[in-house]
Amino acid sequence: MVSCWDTAVLPYALLGCLLLTGYGSGSKLKVPELSLKGTQHVMQAGQTLFLKCRGEAAHSWSLPTTVSQEDKRLSITPPSACGRDNRQFCSTLTLDTAQANHTGLYTCRYLPTSTSKKKKAESSIYIFVSDAGSPFIEMHTDIPKLVHMTEGRQLIIPCRVTSPNVTVTLKKFPFDTLTPDGQRITWDSRRGFIIANATYKEIGLLNCEATVNGHLYQTNYLTHRQTNTILDVQIRPPSPVRLLHGQTLVLNCTATTELNTRVQMSWNYPGKATKRASIRQRIDRSHSHNNVFHSVLKINNVESRDKGLYTCRVKSGSSFQSFNTSVHVYEKGFISVKHRKQPVQETTAGRRSYRLSMKVKAFPSPEIVWLKDGSPATLKSARYLVHGYSLIIKDVTTEDAGDYTILLGIKQSRLFKNLTATLIVNVKPQIYEKSVSSLPSPPLYPLGSRQVLTCTVYGIPRPTITWLWHPCHHNHSKERYDFCTENEESFILDPSSNLGNRIESISQRMTVIEGTNKTVSTLVVADSQTPGIYSCRAFNKIGTVERNIKFYVTDVPNGFHVSLEKMPAEGEDLKLSCVVNKFLYRDITWILLRTVNNRTMHHSISKQKMATTQDYSITLNLVIKNVSLEDSGTYACRARNIYTGEDILRKTEVLVRDSEAPHLLQNLSDYEVSISGSTTLDCQARGVPAPQITWFKNNHKIQQEPGIILGPGNSTLFIERVTEEDEGVYRCRATNQKGAVESAAYLTVQGTSDKSNLELITLTCTCVAATLFWLLLTLFIRKLKRSSSEVKTDYLSIIMDPDEVPLDEQCERLPYDASKWEFARERLKLGKSLGRGAFGKVVQASAFGIKKSPTCRTVAVKMLKEGATASEYKALMTELKILTHIGHHLNVVNLLGACTKQGGPLMVIVEYCKYGNLSNYLKSKRDLFCLNKDAALHMELKKESLEPGLEQGQKPRLDSVSSSSVTSSSFPEDRSVSDVEGDEDYSEISKQPLTMEDLISYSFQVARGMEFLSSRKCIHRDLAARNILLSENNVVKICDFGLARDIYKNPDYVRRGDTRLPLKWMAPESIFDKVYSTKSDVWSYGVLLWEIFSLGGSPYPGVQMDEDFCSRLKEGMRMRTPEYATPEIYQIMLDCWHKDPKERPRFAELVEKLGDLLQANVQQDGKDYIPLNAILTRNSSFTYSTPTFSEDLFKDGFADPHFHSGSSDDVRYVNAFKFMSLERIKTFEELSPNSTSMFEDYQLDTSTLLGSPLLKRFTWTETKPKASMKIDLRIASKSKEAGLSDLPRPSFCFSSCGHIRPVQDDESELGKESCCSPPPDYNSVVLYSSPPA
């Protein structure tokens, strides 16, 4: 069947085929007719080209290569029936706004068929688009176009034109002109210049020139002759080629030549005489600048006779090249591996790469696996790359130290080898203070002060630290300042050296900072007197680092001080002083600041004195004589900082006061005084400048003498023990430059001298007795305070410098203030036992008058068991001292008192919390949990309506809630001891529903309590829900932050070696490195959050507490989000579980975040909002949805949270904060559940005795050669994990849940029916990784 296809018109292809079928019986097809006749047509640029093709069959168009089919100006209509009886096909081509580059041959041809193949089935016309500005179709002005030529063959220079009338000249650089002669060189406006037999003369740069309307146009071409140059010959695979007997040998010889080069390729090989090889050749022309020839030699089933030298020969004309390769044929495989260097290798941290290589000889090529410390290296880090038999470590760090093993295996030969090398990563010493110091200018040290200089160094091997002293250079020239430089002569310091300042001590200690052991060197300067530079130099075999501490001593506060002697008056002298530290400032001068047109101008002050230089400072005094009012203004001392180059100003305002004549505020008046008495005369005068006051008696000037005292400024006259001679006229005179004023009075003395002496004796005795009394009282008080202050000083030093003294010794030194905490045993009535610890017990008691309360108070008493040892007594006493040190806080179980005196047991009295620990309380509330207060309120109303028996005195059934911890109310409430009253209180709280607000509140309170404990340098080390106690008014308190606990019977404590540890709550650094810090408490707080929002669920349910759990935790696996946690809460958990302790939030930050959540949950108000978890819709029941954590969920920062919700109009919201983008989180496997009771889910964490077997590693063993061996690189399967049971799902809010109306702002009543959320399912456990660092 004849196939017919038209690229332009699909619908008419079938019709064309049918028509052709009719003509195929013997009719001849006429060639297609074009609407433009002739072989060529000339049109102007910008005109529209219209061509119509009429034919007897379906046809298509062929266009010049410069015309794009996608050009919007081109339009081709598909062939359609036309002519008589519609037996012809017509198609049109329209090209709008034709351009010069549209010049070319346009062809209309029939679609190929069996009928038209033998005949001319096309019509063509050459269209010239004439453009005076573009005479050539292609312009090559900057870069000539390459034209390949072969001598003796035709060469075409394709400088085609857009008009047949353009005259073109062909020139050869530099001055030759090639003129067409009609034979050897001809011109064709459609093709260009045609050279029949090209010679070497046409090699070079040719250009075509045309002049149109007086403008010269050029297009350039570069001819290139074919050569015989062989660029390269290679054989693949490279030499040597190794094969096993019976394999196939394939050698590919590749010859690279220049274009237009032809080659002859041949082989020489051992079996050439017998033609052992088959050879095939091919040419690769895909390269634009070269030709590539291939000759492939192949020998099947190689034998020993095929080994030897194989040579590929390449020849092109007179050029010849060859390439050799050697072939080796082996009977069987082999492996040999040795150390290329030493078994223990060293490198340096910071290197861009390090190659760990082995000397391996093997055939065939073995499988290679590198292990680091027993695990695949490439899986541990992307920085590990396997290259051949080498392992390349990129960007070497200290984490790369360890044992590296290369595993080599040839499965088909059953050959296996391994070899281990140890890598030590050395670190150049690093001084951490040097990296964090960013002050532009050095600090100043007060004269005579005691200073402590520290230098924290890290390096491998451990660096040696020395302190050096560089004295300052003293310059006695007045033109230069003193300066200090580290290039001066340096001296090594020791505590006994007398260089520079007196050294109190030089000490070193090891400490763990940010998880690494660092050396802290401390230099204590006892008395800062001499300026200079202290250098801390640390060195090891890798290198040396030095930190220079410029030690500039100053006797000027802050190094810059300006003072004004006094505010001057008109006519007085203005005296200003400027003092700067001479090591920090220079170019000191006084200037006057003036404001002109809102711009501050600096005016220099003439006739300034020279600055004087002292030992530590430079002083510049400014004195202006006889000032006037115009001298008022802002005076500034300007000095240039030597290090920053910045001009520093210190300003002082000067206001020159106008002169004012003196005047008296009150005149003197006559006065009578008894003999032996005393009197005071006041003469208060004002004036500018301040007047000078002079006293006269009977016109004689009074001078100060015994019995006559002149007060400040002579304004008062005090006469002691008046005698008869003191009677007379007293006159005071106030004088300044504006004038004088005076006042006088007569002093009359009454009485006799005998009476005066008696009074004098009596007064003297009284004063002496009073003085002795106050002196004795002062000495007594100071003696009482002395011991207390000394103990307090020692105590503070212990707390503030914990690394100087061991922790147990610190606790032993802590003071115990018996006057504050001691409580009489006879006022304490012991009651029932609350629990027993490792060496103590806790009992409930009633304390009468504790904390100065006039009533009885229920408390908890911690005391030792019978037969306690001295060490146990010391431990409980240490706990008591710690509690006194920590202090009082609302969210901490507080100390109330203690009984330590002889004659009875040691007892520690703390607060009593009657509602037990938070873990059991949350478990008891699983069937009473509601999402918000509205649902909780409706739930209570529903219960009241369905439980009439309670109103008739029927006692409700309570879930059993036990507590093993000491508790008390957080509020100082005095009440009588009454168990019935306590039971009634608990009955009330047991009936109250638990809401989401309560869970957030518990989390917030615990964060506040831990923030307080961390501020008191207290690390809890066992923060869990079992150690959180619930008190009245929904207040939670942290306990057991120092109390002994019975870890031997508690299933939450797992044995590791000889120690039981709460592994589920412990941070990785605590498990593996025994490092406890506030950041490890933050990790435990994250697990506590999981307990709270799972309503008392046990962490990692169903996961066996073994070494596998620890390794998976270290690899980044985490728990899945608990049932009732919102995305914000779960994000906080992940933040707390960050692998790097430094990236975990501080408790202060957790308080802030949870405080925002709590406030938003209460007020339903905030900035940015997302749905919490309770959604009220108009047309759906009250539902609860657990957020699905996926990649999509975290993609847009919870912009579109994945909650099951209906309408979003009536949604309750909680204030949100930004989330970090999370990678896909690794999870624990989900486990099949087993049956268990709700209150026994903690028993899933049963104590697991962890032995000491190593973690599973990759090991290969060798056996006899004939034995079956294989390499198995799979990790051993994980141990079976204990499952969780299906928890019973009790009915919430009773069996039916009605629809709830949306809560509107103006509604005050809830719907008649409501529903709480279902209980959590703790059977599915998913492990999450911490967010990326």
Swiss-Prot record:
Tell me where in this chain the Ig-like C2-type domain is found: 32-124, 152-215, 231-328, 334-429, 430-550, 557-656, 662-748
Cystine connections: C53-C108, C159-C208, C253-C312, C455-C536, C578-C637, C683-C732
Query: Annotated site (Cleavage), which positions?
Result: V768, A769
Q: What is known of its domains?
A: The second and third Ig-like C2-type (immunoglobulin-like) domains are sufficient for VEGFA binding.
Instruction: Report TM segments.
Output: 760-781
Q: Which organism is it from?
A: Mus musculus (Mouse)
Predominantly, its location class is membrane
Q: What protein name is recorded for this chain? A: Vascular endothelial growth factor receptor 1
Gene Ontology terms describing biological process: angiogenesis; blood vessel morphogenesis; branching involved in blood vessel morphogenesis; cell differentiation; cell migration; chemotaxis; embryonic morphogenesis; hyaloid vascular plexus regression
